[in-house]
Structure formats: structure tokens, C-alpha cells
């Protein structure tokens, strides 16, 4: 742990095509072995597929999808008197976005389409329409928090 106080949060630069920090964060989440160029190409091609399929701007569709994926509540383990309780807590805005992007990429990777571009595009389209595995993950997270509402008084 640093002795000089909290470490400053590094800000990402907006991407060149859409001028969005959110897109840059998605590119960074998708990146494997430091190959950012490849990640960028995949994302931009996925956005082209989104544009073809939905007849809307890909950024609008992506932002709607992310809004549908981001969780509001989650559970965190809290040990009280020898027992572990799943305590529901509200998700901070920064973590909300991070989880949304992480789930989007992870569940896109698990899809059955042939290329990553197609997988990502269809996961974004599904999420924008409140369907898909990443939205289901958010629903499951919320259900878990709802089921453990009785332990809400243990939150810290």
C-alpha cells in the first residue's frame, strides 16, 4: 500500500473514430496480449455490423446496451460472528460501468458466432433490446441482492 496517499486514477484518451472514452475503455477490456490495434479493428467492424443491422448510430445502440447491462445492486460477502452473509450494496458509478463493459466482452466471447466482430455486435444488439447473456447476468445479480435484502443492515 502506498504511503503517499491514494493513487491518482489515470484517465483514458478518447478513441479517434467516435471520440469517446467509453469506447476506449471497451477496446482496452477486449485487448489480449497488448494488441490494441487488433482490438480496435474488431470493435469498429462490430460497430459497422450494428449499423447495418439496426439502422441506428452504433454509439446510441452501444450506450443503450451498456445502460441495460450495468448493475445497480450487487452482493458482497460480510463475515459476522462466524457466518458469511451476502450483503446487498449499491454499486458505485465507476464500478457499474466497469462491470457492464466486462460482462459485455466476456459474454460476447462465449457466443457461438464465427468471428469476434459478429459476437460483439450481436451481444450489443441483444443487450440494447434487453436480451442476451450479459443482461441476464445483471438480472441474476439483482435477484441475488433482492433475495438477501434481509441482510442489508449489515452493510458498511
Swiss-Prot record:
GO terms for molecular function: rRNA binding; structural constituent of ribosome; tRNA binding. SUPFAM superfamilies: Ribosomal protein S7. The keyword 4Fe-4S does not apply. Gene3D superfamilies: Ribosomal protein S7 domain. Keywords: Ribonucleoprotein, Ribosomal protein, RNA-binding, rRNA-binding, tRNA-binding. The keyword Zinc does not apply. GO terms for cellular component: small ribosomal subunit. Coiled coil: none annotated. GO terms for biological process: translation. InterPro entries: Ribosomal_uS7, Ribosomal_uS7_bac/org-type, Ribosomal_uS7_CS, Ribosomal_uS7_dom, Ribosomal_uS7_dom_sf. PANTHER family: RIBOSOMAL PROTEIN S7. Belongs to the universal ribosomal protein uS7 family. One of the primary rRNA binding proteins, it binds directly to 16S rRNA where it nucleates assembly of the head domain of the 30S subunit. Is located at the subunit interface close to the decoding center, probably blocks exit of the E-site tRNA. Part of the 30S ribosomal subunit. Contacts proteins S9 and S11. This is Small ribosomal subunit protein uS7. It comes from Bacillus cereus (strain G9842). The lineage of its organism: Bacteria, Bacillati, Bacillota, Bacilli, Bacillales.
Amino acid at each position: 500500500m502506498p504511503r503517499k496517499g491514494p493513487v491518482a486514477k489515470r484517465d483514458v484518451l478518447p478513441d479517434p473514430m467516435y471520440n469517446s472514452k467509453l469506447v476506449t475503455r471497451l477496446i482496452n477490456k477486449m485487448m489480449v496480449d497488448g494488441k490494441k490495434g487488433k482490438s480496435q479493428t474488431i470493435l469498429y467492424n462490430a460497430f459497422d455490423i450494428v449499423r447495418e443491422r439496426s439502422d441506428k448510430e452504433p454509439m446510441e445502440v452501444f450506450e443503450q446496451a451498456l445502460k441495460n447491462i450495468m448493475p445497480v445492486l450487487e452482493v458482497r460477502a460480510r463475515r459476522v460472528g462466524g457466518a458469511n452473509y451476502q450483503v446487498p450494496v449499491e454499486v458505485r458509478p465507476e464500478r457499474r460501468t466497469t462491470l457492464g463493459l466486462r460482462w459485455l466482452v466476456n459474454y460476447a466471447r462465449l457466443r457461438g458466432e464465427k468471428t469476434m466482430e459478429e459476437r460483439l455486435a450481436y451481444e450489443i444488439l441483444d443487450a440494447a433490446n434487453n436480451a442476451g447473456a450479459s443482461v441476464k447476468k445483471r438480472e441474476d445479480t439483482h435477484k441475488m441482492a433482492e433475495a438477501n435484502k434481509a441482510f442489508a443492515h449489515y452493510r458498511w
